Amino acid sequence: MSNPLEFPWLSVLVLLPLLAAFGIPLIPQSRWVRWYALAVGAFDLGLMAYVFARHYDLQDFSLQLAERYAWVPQIGFHWSLAVDGLSLPLVLLSGLITTLSIVAAWNLSHKPRLFFFLLLLMYGAQVGVFLAQDMLLFFLMWEIELVPVYLLISIWGGPKRQYAATKFILYTAAASIFILVGSLAMAFYGEGFSLEMAELSAKSYPLALELLAYAALLIAFGVKLPIFPLHTWLPDAHSEASAPISMILAGVLLKMGGYGLIRMNVGMLSEAHVYFAPVLAVLGVVNIIYGALAAFGQNHLKRRLAYSSIAHMGFVLIGISAFTELGINGAVLQMISHGLIAAVLFFLTGITYERTHTLALDKLGGLAKQMPKAFALFTAGSLASLALPGMSGFVGELTVFLGLTTSDAYAPTFKAGIALLAAVGIILTPIYLLSMLRQVFYGAQDPGLVLEDYLGDVRPREMAVALCLLLPILGIGFYPRLATQTYDVTTVAVAAQLRSVLATEIVQRPFFPSPVQSAQVAALPLED
């Protein structure tokens, strides 16, 4: 073990929920299971906060609290964990949203043992994905996470849950193959076989191999993010999943795709990123505009929010492609912000369904009078999603825009085109979100709508969950350093690495021009 503190903090964070899940069958009464799951989730979240507050140096961009144990040495497989500024905020986000999803599922009566067992398994696997430093361990955690999600949708989902769950597992399992392909392509190249991310990153690959590995990983992470046209599993999964699972799907699972792109495609395959970055920028714009336009056509509340998530993830792609500190910083901030915003909106959607038993927008209406607290919370979440100043959504999107427009890696016309098209998507966002609010809460109530009066407005438990998500949204909006201080040192290092590689590529590989290289070459002084 390389951790100088001589205590495996990160292993505890990963293994605690995984092992605790197997204690659920031993609980004598079903009503105690939710308390047990909540205790495990809250303790793990509290332990994260303690470990990172006491033992993590925010000014150090390198990997910290590293642990490395030989697991299957015959194939070079190690239990290797570490944390840096990129993984730290996403680990905390995973802990917060999963713990709150346990509270959101408090009244679950159908197979609670199995539900919370799967939820804790998924929790541990998510944390493992963000902390893994061995590609095979990363792949293992990635795969462990898929099975609980499939079962949570197929057992506790809506009428078309089997279709949605099958589509999810087919898309994501097929995409996982590309993680394995890309990892093995890098591991087998050169002298010695290694799956350690640090060693793979230190290798120098032929351009063709690096481009191939980058493309494979882009497909894998593009399904999870998701990137158009690999997105079609997401609206179906959200529309059929229960609210607590939708909170995790949008709040954490999509971020695994963005994390993988930055950690591996950008961090480990920087030379290939020079060639793919313009493609990511274009795909980001497609995500933004397509997601916004598709959201307009949805009559189902959760499907509209699902397409909204696709649009918001487009900003992550643009930030990753910018080659600037602000761009990478904005991409990470957008992931954190969207995780909080999407989680609260899907949670409030679940409350709406619990009261009305429908999510069809043409059957809803006039709920503001009966549910004023829900209306206020839903309005706050929607305003955050449309990037109202003073909320985290505004800071994330603004930082991405600044990162793109201040980049000198692209020709001015290319930057202007990307920025203009992304701005069109921003204009469309308030239209479909405010229209959604109007359809749900304003106007006359549908005569056929039966409101469960005995449930009333938002209850204290539900209010607590919503506020635990909205307060960080407001806090980051007014003081972005609450989030950015956890990772800005790391994003500076990533951007510096990209700039160095970009300059080298222009000199050494002028054949294979890209918009990035063309802009840089045009800016070079001409020789006499």
Swiss-Prot record:
Signal peptide: none annotated. Keywords: Membrane, NAD, NADP, Plastoquinone, Quinone, Thylakoid, Translocase, Transmembrane, Transmembrane helix. One of its GO terms (biological process) is electron transport coupled proton transport. It is found in: Cellular thylakoid membrane. One of its GO terms (cellular component) is plasma membrane-derived thylakoid membrane. InterPro entries: NADH_Q_OxRdtase_chain4 (IPR022997), NADH_Q_OxRdtase_chainM/4 (IPR010227), NADH_UbQ_OxRdtase (IPR003918), ND/Mrp_TM (IPR001750). Its EC number is 7.1.1.-. Belongs to the complex I subunit 4 family. This is NAD(P)H-quinone oxidoreductase chain 4 1. The gene is ndhD1.
